[in-house]
């Protein structure tokens, strides 16, 4: 028998008060235990008001108990879906929760399966070693490599790099580009190339005499460089000498030569290790002038130069001379290298000023005008 309203028309104390518009509905555990059901627990509730669009299991169980208590049915007789189904479609609260759990499990399984396949594919790629061809094949292919492509060829694999270390490779390269009309120094002639000592360095030097693409590179060497060379910074001065040049001019010119050893690229990158040629080919790769270069400055007058051998070259500038007709070269030497872009004071170090300057040239160790020992 239904109970009527309380005295004076006031609502019953157990009546559920509806929340104000715009406030979020929060689920509390004691509300579920007491069998309290709100609009937010249904599937067609406003998602802007409800924090999550998914019905929690605790809420679904509370709804089931509420339906059972209202209908007076046992749990084993009537399913909750039938009790909740009215004139319209059923609100599949429990099914929606189970379906979402199943979907999440399927997504998780697919993600794990995809990761396993990706890992298995990566292991298969790592395990695939490929074909390893014998050294004779690479030596045969090296006979068709241009001199400017030797570096790219050596980077193909370790066997290709090993081939470029052999004496046979450099000897064949020399014979392939040698011509009878080539004007070569005594050390670079065929009768001297039978020596294995410094064979690689001598072949590279000879290519700048015989190979046209290499010779064209050094032919475009202006008397005064367009920009001040920056590769000599922190180089060590190994040797210094000057000589008198008698030419068409009434007064002779003077040539000042500074031999530098550049800072090793391994020291710049702080890399002490690296590929070393095989022991049996160390004599072939020996080069006393490795990382060396020659700075040659020609002046119109003789200029006294202080002793700078053994010092570190830290500053190099080329400016216009005071007469606006020639150039002025300033060299600064220090006892130790300068790192971190630290600027030097004008009074620090040993300064060498050459003025007026006729020409400034920089020669690497493979340049034809670089002086090298005949014993190399």
Swiss-Prot record:
Residues 1-20, 102-127 are annotated as: Disordered. Keywords: Membrane, Transmembrane, Transmembrane helix. The chain crosses the membrane at residues 300-320. Expressed in brain, lung, pancreas, thymus, intestine and blood. Not detected in heart, placenta, liver, muscle, kidney, spleen, prostate, testis, ovary and colon. GO terms for cellular component: membrane; SCF ubiquitin ligase complex. It is a single-pass membrane protein. It is found in: Membrane. It comes from the Eukaryota. Belongs to the TMEM183 family. This gene was derived from TMEM183A through retroposition after the divergence of human and chimpanzee. PANTHER family: TRANSMEMBRANE PROTEIN 183A-RELATED (PTHR20988:SF2). This is Putative transmembrane protein 183BP.
């Amino acid at each position: 028998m239904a109970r009527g309203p309380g005295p004076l028309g006031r609502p019953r104390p157990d009546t559920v008060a509806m929340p104000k518009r715009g406030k979020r509905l929060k689920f509390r555990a004691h509300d579920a235990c007491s069998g309290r059901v709100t609009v937010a627990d249904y599937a067609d509730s406003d998602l802007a008001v409800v924090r999550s669009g998914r019905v929690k299991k605790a809420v679904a169980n509370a709804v089931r108990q509420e339906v059972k208590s209202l209908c007076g049915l046992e749990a084993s007789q009537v399913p909750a879906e039938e009790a909740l189904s009215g004139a319209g479609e059923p609100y599949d609260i429990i099914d929606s929760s189970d379906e979402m759990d199943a979907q999440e499990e399927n997504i998780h399984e697919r993600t794990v399966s995809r990761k396993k396949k990706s890992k298995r594919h990566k292991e298969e790629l790592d395990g695939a070693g490929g074909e390893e061809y014998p050294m004779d094949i690479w030596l045969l292919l090296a006979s068709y490599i241009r001199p400017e492509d030797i570096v790219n060829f050596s980077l193909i694999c370790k066997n290709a790099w090993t081939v470029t270390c052999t004496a046979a490779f450099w000897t064949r390269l020399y014979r392939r580009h040698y011509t009878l009309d080539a004007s070569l120094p005594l050390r670079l002639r065929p009768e001297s190339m039978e020596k294995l000592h410094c064979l690689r360095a001598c072949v590279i030097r000879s290519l700048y005499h015989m190979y046209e693409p290499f010779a064209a590179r050094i032919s475009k060497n202006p008397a005064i460089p367009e920009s001040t060379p920056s590769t000599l910074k922190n180089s060590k001065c190994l040797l210094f000498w000057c000589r008198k040049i008698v030419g068409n001019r009434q007064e002779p010119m003077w040539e000042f030569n500074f031999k530098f050893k550049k800072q090793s690229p391994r020291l710049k990158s702080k890399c002490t290790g690296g590929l070393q040629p095989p022991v049996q080919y160390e004599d072939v790769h020996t080069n006393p002038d490795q990382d060396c270069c020659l700075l040659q400055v020609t002046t119109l007058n003789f200029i006294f130069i202080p002793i700078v051998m053994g010092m570190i070259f830290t500053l190099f500038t080329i400016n216009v001379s005071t007469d606006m007709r020639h150039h002025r070269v300033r060299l600064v030497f220090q006892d130790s290298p300068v790192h971190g872009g630290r600027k030097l004071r004008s009074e620090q170090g040993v300064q060498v000023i050459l003025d007026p300057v006729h020409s400034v040239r920089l020669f690497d160790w493979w340049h034809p005008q670089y002086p090298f020992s005949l014993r190399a």
